[in-house]
Amino acid sequence: MSTSGSRDSASTRESARETRAGPQALPLGSVVSLSSMRSASPTHAPWVAKPTTSVDLTNHFMEVAARGGEEERSLASPGEEMQYELAHSMKAAPALPRELPSPFRAAGGRGALPQEKQFFVLTAAGKPIYSMHGPEELVMGLMGIAHTLLNYFELDGPRERLRTITTYDAHGVLQRFAFLRKKHVVLLAMTTRNEAEAELQQQLDLLYSYLVSSLSLRQMSRLFERANFDLRSFLTESDFHNLDQLCRAMCDGTHLGWTLGALECITLKHSVRQRINSIMLRATRGLAVGTLLYGMIVAPDHRLVSVLRPKGHTLHTTDLQLLFSMVENQLQLLHSSQEVWVPLCFPKFNGNGFLYCYIKFLPTDTDSASNETTLEGNMHIKPTLILISPQKSSFYDLHTCASEILDNLAVAGIMPHITAPSRFTINDIPAPLVHHFIYKSKKYVQYVMPETSSTTDWSTLMKYYSHLRSNALDSHGNPLSENVVAFARWCASSGQVQVEYCDSSEELQVEDQPSSIFSESFVEESLNMTGLSWITPSFELYLLCNNGEIPKAVVMKSARNVVGWCSRNGHKLFVSEGAVF
């Protein structure tokens, strides 16, 4: 494909993704184009391939030996040269320590991208599409290695498809490489965090789903029919910005729902939620059949308030998470008087076509003040009303519907419940010595958690939750048994993590269960913390106790109290049905 043809295609797709404005006679707020919200993407310099033969993957890619000048490097063997590239692709900034500090207090600001993790996307033919960080000339060599490895393991057919490569040292897992191969693209994750294979595969699937949401499978197949097609020339600057934000969020652990495969809800009285549902249903009565496919009201930080859906149908959690990510990364600078009309492919719903999203932010008390939200990822995401249609000409109909919904919410005095929702606290639950927990309802595919302190380092806290979750799952992400309980204890003095499994029905026999030891390093000598994972067919519970020696029987009793409390208050904690039409 020629360069000019690629640019014309990109221009065509950009014009298709512009927001639609209506006739001047209709008194609308400003309808904003997504192209005006783009951020600069990394400069795409020509990629330089180097001849490679092999690389010693047993060496830690974060531990880089001191190198001399270019003359000394030119004398290195091909294997040593690629080991140098492997290491320096992760060294755009000084390496971060692997130690887990105290999970209860933040150490500082966001800082640079974590250098202990890397994501790559390349075509099935080995051409680079995206890398999270690292000099392009070094990343190119690493992508070449990944492509060679994948092809080698597929010599005997797809049944031998490579999924992970894990290296170990005396202290356990040193580094892990996870691969996800699709029809047209290959995705690779590299980490030193001892993350489970299933978690990495889930993250790669989210990146792939984003590409599909931006292009659609039909368009991707059509594009890759061209000889020597370079997908980078077709992706927009906002696409690369969104990929950066997705990767960074997965490294920081700021979006727990991506790991759990669930949505977070606000705590709301059942009667208030029912009034919201009634208001949404009344506003849809004037719409023609087929105009509205799905709708939702989302509180700050992407916490679900209610959904508007047809009977027997719903959207996949991944599709909604991609929609929320787009709103977070591209639209947060908009004022509540502005509206957006944007096409988006929902890969889990229908990867071959686009749906059309009407997006409007709800008015808040801060609208009159200076807007401090930036595209760099402010955690306070604005409350939003989203209506989704299969018809690209339905903007005016959905605008009328949205206006009626917002007006009636304001008249009913419900808006403060949405724009400034509160969380329950750990003190609301009779669970002694529990510091924090995450409870997921498998029936509703939603989760809740108590309020945390403003000084909590959420990224570090998520590392503990990730460890707890991996203890209860196998390499494919399935529970070790139908009803599994796993205890974990972090002890800084011994530098070890003790994990014990038991049957949840045997509350008083947990002390006699066999244990296995996993190594991990810690910074604070006073750390002595217990955690629990409890997975059943109906719920998942991940619980962290206060620092100190706590008997497992006490932890189990508190866990049962948490489960009982969440079950009794499910009508407040979760969106059970929503507004069904």
Curated annotation (Swiss-Prot):
Region (Disordered): 1-28
GO biological process, one term: protein targeting to vacuolar membrane
UniProt entry keywords in alphabetical sequence: Autophagy, Endosome, Membrane, Protein transport, Transport, Vacuole
Transmembrane portions of the chain: none
GO annotations of cellular component type: cytosol; fungal-type vacuole membrane; Mon1-Ccz1 complex; multivesicular body membrane
Molecular function, one GO term: guanyl-nucleotide exchange factor activity
Topology in the lipid bilayer: Peripheral membrane protein
Compositionally biased residues, Basic and acidic residues: 10-20
Record's subcellular location: Endosome, Multivesicular body membrane; Prevacuolar compartment membrane; Vacuole membrane
Function, in words: In complex with CCZ1, is required for multiple vacuole delivery pathways including the cytoplasm to vacuole transport (Cvt), autophagy, pexophagy and endocytosis. The MON1-CCZ1 complex acts at the fusion of vesicles with the vacuole, through its regulation of the SNARE complex during the coordinated priming and docking stages of fusion, and particularly at the stage of tethering/docking.
Sequence similarity: Belongs to the MON1/SAND family.
Name the record gives this protein: Vacuolar fusion protein MON1
Species, as recorded: Eremothecium gossypii (strain ATCC 10895 / CBS 109.51 / FGSC 9923 / NRRL Y-1056)
Phylogenetic lineage: Eukaryota, Fungi, Dikarya, Ascomycota, Saccharomycotina
